[in-house]
């Protein structure tokens, strides 16, 4: 019985006076939370940079595809043109040369 009392007293003293790691573990948990928040922000910034680079690359590829595609909505040779109806690439929108009574400009071949 004396042995049990001695162990109980020893257990009581060790739990009340003993140094617990609760404060240390709470501080470590807080530090880990702060570090994980910082690392998450850094990771997010890196992902945004990668995404921006990919979007730029995709945009450039789309522009190249558009450059190779057929030209749309352009006016042909000797057809009236204005700000709404543009001439095709190899044509230019000019006033008719010998006729002053035409009211609009026409698409002509570019002079070399």
Swiss-Prot record:
GO CC aspect terms: extracellular region
Question: What GO MF terms are annotated?
Answer: sodium channel inhibitor activity; toxin activity
Q: Where in the cell is it found?
A: Secreted
Q: Which of UniProt's keywords are assigned here?
A: Cleavage on pair of basic residues, Disulfide bond, Ion channel impairing toxin, Secreted, Signal, Toxin
- The secretion signal range is 1-18
**Expression across tissues:** Expressed by the venom gland.
Q: Which residues form the propeptide?
A: 19-73
* S-S bonds: 74-88, 81-93, 87-107
Is Signal among the key words of this record? yes
Q: What is its main location?
A: secreted
Domains: entry comment: The presence of a 'disulfide through disulfide knot' structurally defines this protein as a knottin.
Q: Which family does it belong to?
A: Belongs to the neurotoxin 14 (magi-1) family. 08 (Ltx-4) subfamily.
Instruction: Tell me the function of this protein.
Output: Probable ion channel inhibitor.
Report the protein name in the record.
U15-hexatoxin-Hi1a
What species is given as this protein's source?
Hadronyche infensa (Fraser island funnel-web spider)
